[in-house]
Amino acid sequence: MSTLRFKVVEEAYGRKAVPVAIPSERPSEYYGKYVFNRAQMYKYLDKDTYDALVYAIDNKEPLSRRLADRVAAGMKQWAMDNGARHYSHWFHPLTDGTAEKHDGFIEHDGKGGVVEEFSGKLLVQQEPDASSFPNGGIRNTFEARGYSAWDISSPAFIIDHTLCIPTIFISYTGESLDYKTPLLRALNSVDKAGAAVARYFDENVKHVISYLGWEQEYFLVDKALYAARPDLVMTGRTLMGHESAKNQQLEDHYFGSIPSRVEAFMLDLEIECHKLGIPAKTRHNEVAPNQFELAPVYEETNLANDHNLLLMSLMTEVADRHNFEVLLHEKPFAGVNGSGKHNNWSLGTDTGAMLFSPGKTPKDNLQFITFLANVMAAVQRHNGLLKASIASATNEHRLGANEAPPAIISMFLGAQITDVIDRLLDTDVDDDIAFSAKEGMKLKNVSQIPELLVDNTDRNRTSPFAFTGNRFEFRALGSSANCASAMIALNAAVADQLTKFKEAVDARIAAGEIKERAILEEAKKLFRENKAIHFDGNGYSDEWKEEAARRGLDCEASVPRIFDAYLKPESVEMFKRTGVFTDVELEARNEVKWEMYTKKLQIEARVLGDLAINHIIPVATRYQSLLLDNVMKIKSIFDGDDSGLAEQEKETIRKIAKHMYVIKDEVTKMVNARKDANKVENEREKAILYHDTVKPCMDVVRYHIDKLELMVDNEMWPLPKYRELLFIR
């Protein structure tokens, strides 16, 4: 293995940037080339079909079978003109990834040959095996039927010569088995509730749209180095490995010059994104070595989420062309920053108003204050649920460390917004809702630099849910996660709160109160009642943890127990009121969450035990034997005053023996703890046992392996080290 390590290190060092074929056209000319967008619909559908489809999309109405047949014919022709040979329903099962089954367009022609066919029935509905996906007990092998159905609001696309049709995925009995179905329900709920409140300010509002702009962080590792690390291959993270002498302490990687191999990968990925209609815009080095970020222009939430899932698949494919492996795990390396996926979330109306943007008039500002107060109330009431929506076995390694938001949900507003709220609560005058515009700041002694415009809020990187000027940044989501999980909880909670708010305001108006006064008083009431969630300080501090507990916020840090928030009465009732989940769906999803947590730790424990006993212990034993031989030879030559020359080697031998003893002992304990946990049938209790008994053993095993790495001869160490994984680019 040590020979393999040096071979792959040499191979990785010899890599050069792979040339990228840059299109001769501008990005705007090939953007969406492989997407059945409205421009392509207009080209391949007759006018009546096009108008009917666009109307159905804009008004969220189902397609008739006759219309579906006409759309399918045009879509098939477009797909085949662009090289597609197969089609697939593309959906998001409860695995955090995507699923697809490819079928050819061919059908018998009755003459011994085939013809290309694609009907509306095949476009609109398919029947995947529901029992083979995570389902929380809703489906069994003997009752396996499930349905996928076309989501017309997300355009079809072509990838690898396959027409992919975004779909929902439900069971034969109607329960959702995916992320898209409840996401669409939550978005419809916030649309309806938000529009009802927005019409207080503009009676022309018909819809409120949820927007999402994600920021995808990731690591790149050379393919050869990756293949020589079984833990990376099997679990997505390093289960052992001592920090390199240099990691991120010089702060020289963030926004640094992008390495040539990486820049070629980024360029290739960006071109592929644009062809698939993903508006990739920003790329840069992140904080940790070999860590990077890609961010797009924001989009409607459902489409943005589809694009993020598509991007993660694309990254793996493009990285392979550049001899990289993409690591989307939240914490692939200890001792350096992990990876997240900030979700920039906002609401806007179909008339063009952005509801989280402070306005220039009292009316606009009252609207802003109204929606701000409702978000604040929703986040406080459901802070435990929002934390559960981003919790996972992988994100557990990242949250709460001084690199990511704490495992306590709070809301940052900034000094100016806080000052306005404080003034509102101290006055009865409603025209006091005023926000200063961006102020000019001139740099001293640098006359050639133009005046800078300073935003009305600072940035608090320690806040998990921060207001950033015209949107909220939900920073706690993990890099490998499906954004839908967080967006479902957030949009549903806000929708439920807006509905309550409207009922309260309408009651005041019915009692004779002026509309503006009724709105303001209800908003002020929400600010008063939900102060506990507002925190602009250092979320990393121990003082905040104590203060958060005093405020009654959810401070649970154990992921299996965090999941309990989904089944609390206030969560269950909220999801039922908004029509997002039924009781059965919630219980099934939590079963899946606990089961996935257990399985991921189970795999990690098995891999760690194997590497410890079959890779590390043999190498440490061989090195220890070399030291023993050396000690015997020293003693055979030197005696008397020189007999102590072997003491350092003897001490090293003792330390190695101790580390090996603890490793073997803890691996045995870990195996037994796993066996005991596996006997438990209740998924929640099993997950808790893995967290409480298996995970601590893994931490001890890793600690002692990392100590051995510093002691064993570098020439003998079998696995690529952190300095090689993180600094060979």
Model features per residue range: what roles?
Residues 143-328, 337-340, 347-591:
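Glycine-rich, acidic/polar active-site loops that bind/position phosphate-bearing ligands
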Residues 96-112, 131, 229, 236-238, ...:
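Short linear, low-complexity motifs centered on an aromatic residue
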Residues 523-729:
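C-terminal amphipathic alpha-helical interaction region
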Residues 12-120, 124-140:
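Histidine/acidic residue-rich metal-binding segments in metalloenzymes
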Residues 1-24, 141-157:
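N-terminal hydrophobic targeting/anchoring segments and the immediately downstream early-domain regions
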Residues 308, 330-331, 357-361, 485-494, ...:
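Composition- and surface-driven signal marking solvent-exposed, interaction-prone regions
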Residues 67, 91, 119, 296-298, ...:
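Active-site proximal loops enriched in glycine and acidic residues that flank catalytic Cys/His/Asp
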Residues 67-71, 91-93, 121-122, 169, ...:
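Active-site-proximal loop/turn and secondary-structure-junction residues that shape catalytic pockets
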